[in-house]
Regions:
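Long luminal/extracellular ectodomains of secretory-pathway precursor proteins
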Residues: 1-643
Length: 643
């Protein structure tokens, strides 16, 4: 491999030149990549075209052909969609792969474009009980295996229900890797809470002075769907509670009905194909374009369960909160929403989980509230005393609302648990100020107010609410947040002023922009530094004979293996860049640091973020150091990925 330093070309936007109408043309055909045959009647869309460009969406003809005419010079993309197929794009060489840009010169006419689209796959099988009898109307779900923050995860996919033979069929699967599951969550809630919830739904909110608005109070705790599921399926009464087995994360779907025998409730716990109680032990199926996998059967078995009861208290006493139980060791499915059991505490803080099988669990309790519009909720700073103005250099503002949380491990055996104490604590806030360092004029107050921040968990877990995970800037560019759960976070800035990019996030003299910020107490002194000198990395990819390689994808990742995991959902230092049709690539705004670069066939890049893959690629990659605000270029040769 070679790595040459030089100037980086700049991307061009579509524009008209000269006096006449533009005459550029893009023409091609939609194909099935398995056999190369044309696919007729797909919808084809042109991206990057100016608003005046005629017909940016066309329908391919019966031979799969399409054409866009009257185009100015510029950079374009082409995508294709058709029922029964995964979306395709020019330059996409694998399902869900990166598209490729097309650089069109003034008056240039390109007529050899091929757009692949892949047929959906399907999975079918039968769900039976312990006696081999079919289970009817039961939710079955596909979960796609992905790499998130450097670790394998299962992402929720389509849900179907079994027919009167217990047979299911999950269509419309993008080719890839999947687990198949019959999810089952034992959801319960106090009748007093359900009655109040239903009454308020009919009267559009709290109906008496001082009465709690259940929907408002629980909307940021994930409990509204739980109450709706219990109402929808008319749950079984157990004491002063209503209880239902529901297909977790599947609106309107149900799990097999529980039974009561020997004084204990028996339920069908979540089960993965072929006979796995957890996602970590599930079989992973690989489905290819157009393939239908059959006999993916799942047999369920009843499990005896126990009740888990106790009291929730917050800093000011007993309160109503949402509680969940998840298996303690099943990290692969930690974000699928497949809780073993959920419940709510009543106004006195009392709660009961119903239908909990034996095992070890993590109990999580949450109560989060965010003001609908500004003003005085818990945690908001008080106004200055009457007759006094605010200080000229006010402290970092604090957003209203609050987040109370608890998490603890519990072991459930054959006997009920009756006296569990759950003590909620307040979450933590992130605050700080911003500095704009560069030759450009300082951004105006109304501009910096339009910035926002995202607090990205290092392990990419879902936050209790996306709203709580957002931060705001005031007119002085001071950052404030809602209360967050403890953990490790990256601070990502959205919509910075034009010409400025985030350079660093410093806390106590340490740059935490590229390492997760541990949040175990309020942070008030974060300094976000913006620069008007963004870095740029560009170059050329060649094949084995020295010609340009348009089939390559360039990967950029840190030299330090510590940066290959726990980098959140929006990593700054890992990039996959699809080269253009001339084998050229470019990316901007990489933080300064030491990187590895490698070009590989795009077909081989599906799981490139797996640390095991990166470890292999690191031995073949080119090392490069990128300084703050530096422009570098590199010439790479495509490397085959070792099996």
């Amino acid at each position: 491999m070679a790595c040459a330093v030089g100037a980086a070309p700049r991307a061009q936007n579509p524009q008209r030149t000269g006096e006449g109408a533009p005459t550029g043309l893009l023409m091609g055909v939609i194909i099935d990549p398995l056999d190369g045959q044309p696919v007729p009647n797909a919808e084809v869309k042109l991206g990057g075209a100016p608003p005046a460009t005629p017909n940016p969406v066309v329908l391919a003809d019966d031979e799969g052909k399409f054409v866009f005419m009257g185009l100015p010079k510029g950079i374009f993309t082409i995508t294709a969609t058709k029922p029964g197929y995964a979306d395709g794009a020019y330059g996409r060489l694998r399902p869900m792969g990166l598209p490729q840009a097309i650089t069109l010169g003034d008056g240039e006419r390109l007529g050899d474009l091929k757009i692949p689209i892949w047929k959906f796959a399907a999975v079918t099988g039968r769900v039976t009980d312990e006696a081999g009898e079919p289970l009817i109307g039961v939710a079955v779900r596909a979960l796609q295996r992905t790499i998130v923050a450097g670790k394998p995860k299962l992402a929720p996919g389509p849900t179907v229900t079994t027919d009167d033979r217990g047979i299911y069929r999950i269509p419309s699967l993008t080719p890839g890797e999947y687990a198949v599951v019959v999810p089952s969550t034992q959801a319960s809630a106090p009748d007093s809470i359900i009655d109040l919830f239903l009454k308020q739904r009919m009267t559009a909110g709290a109906s008496k002075p001082g009465e709690s608005d259940i929907s408002r109070d629980l909307s940021f705790s994930g409990a509204t769907e739980q109450l709706l599921a219990i109402e929808r399926h008319r749950g079984t009464r157990v004491g002063a509670q209503s209880f239902v087995s529901s297909g977790a994360g599947s609106r309107g779907a149900v799990a097999p009905s529980p039974s009561i025998g020997g004084g204990r409730i028996h339920v069908y716990p979540t089960q993965y194909h072929p006979a796995a109680p957890t996602a970590a032990s599930a079989a992973i199926l690989t489905v290819r374009s157009g393939e239908e996998r059959v006999a993916i059967d799942i047999q369920l078995g009843l499990a005896a369960t126990s009740l888990v009861s106790g009291t929730v208290k917050g800093p000011d006493g007993a309160l109503m909160a949402a509680l969940t139980l998840v298996p303690e060791t099943d990290d692969l499915a930690s974000d699928t929403g497949f809780e073993t059991a959920t419940t709510l505490s009543d106004a006195a803080g009392r709660f009961t989980f119903i239908g909990v099988p034996e095992g070890r669990y993590r109990l999580r309790a949450i109560l989060a509230q965010v003001p609908v519009s500004g003003g005085g909720r818990r945690g908001a700073p008080p106004p200055p005393p009457q007759g006094l103005s605010a200080p000229s250099t006010p402290p970092v503002p604090v957003l209203g609302g609050f987040t109370l949380w608890a998490t603890q491990s519990i072991a459930v055996g054959a006997s009920d648990i009756n006296d569990l104490a759950v003590n909620l604590r307040a979450g933590f806030r992130i605050g700080g100020r911003s500095e704009f360092v560069g030759a450009l004029a300082q951004p105006a107050p109304d501009v910096v107010r339009r910035m926002s921040a995202t607090f990205d968990p290092a392990d990419a877990r879902s936050l209790v609410s996306s709203i709580i995970g957002r931060g705001q800037f005031d007119e002085r560019a001071n950052l404030s947040s809602y209360q967050l759960l403890p953990g490790r976070y990256y601070v990502r800035v959205n919509n910075p002023p034009v010409g400025w990019v985030l350079k660093s996030a410093t806390l106590n003299g340490r740059d935490v922009s590229n390492v997760p910020l541990p949040l175990d107490a309020d942070v008030t002194a974060l300094v976000l530094t913006f620069t008007d000198r963004p870095s740029t990395l560009s170059g050329q990819v060649q094949n084995a004979t020295g010609g340009s390689d348009p089939s390559a994808t360039v990967l950029v990742f840190p030299t330090d293996p510590g940066g290959w995991t726990d980098y959140g959902d929006f990593p700054r230092r890992l990039r996959a860049i699809r080269v253009d049709r001339n084998g050229q690539f470019q990316t901007a705004n990489l933080p300064g640091g030491d990187y590895l670069l490698i070009a590989i066939p795009d077909e081989s890049s599906a799981n490139w973020q797996d640390p095991r893959v990166l470890r292999t690629l690191a031995r073949l990659a080119t090392a490069i150091t990128l300084g703050d605000g530096e422009t570098r270029s590199a010439t790479l040769k495509t490397s085959a990925v070792p099996r």
